[in-house]
Amino acid sequence: MGFVKTREEVARLEKVLSRPRFVGAEMLTIDYLTTPDIVRSILPPGLEPAEEPLITAMVGRWRSNCVADFAGGAIYVAARHKNIEAAYVLAMFMDTDQAIMFGRDLFGEPKKRATSDLRHNGVSFHGYVERFGVRLIDIRAELTTDLGPATVQGAPTSTSRHCRRVTALAVKMILV
């Protein structure tokens, strides 16, 4: 396998990349409210805090047909530009070069290299993201009340679950 690809090899790569699939995802996500001043301090110029100053931290792992298995996490901030409200991706952390390149180089996602892990034992979950030896996200949760299938775009409802009760939580963000 060399750096120069045949037309057939390029066509096979284009076919795989044109239909990316991310399956078997496991994610631990926590939403929490903060103050508009904190949100304003971390948003880039041109964005304002959304009506609700919400921050989301997530740790997870995925399988895919285009970047193999990978793990990572992300921090999202509810933001507004003019009359459009959406989640602004403050940072994404991935544990493989393929996952970083696929999102960053093709779509401009703010991906960085980091280590992460997500484990569970019964209803107890622990997920973290670490970069250069610094723990950036650390979520511990006991998920005891299953509220049924989540309505997540692109996720099969038979396997996406969301829970109400989180009994322990530590979220640390380093913003440099």
PLM feature segments, named:
Residues K5, K15, K82, K111-K112, ...:
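Context-gated lysine
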Residues V10, I30, I38, I42, ...:
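Weak global preference for isoleucine
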Residues M27, A87-V176:
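Internal, well-folded beta-alpha domain core
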Residues P53, A71-G73, N121-V123:
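A generic structural signal for short beta-strands and their flanking turns/coil linkers
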Residues R61-F107:
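Hydrophobic/aromatic-rich structural module bridging two neighboring secondary-structure elements via a short loop
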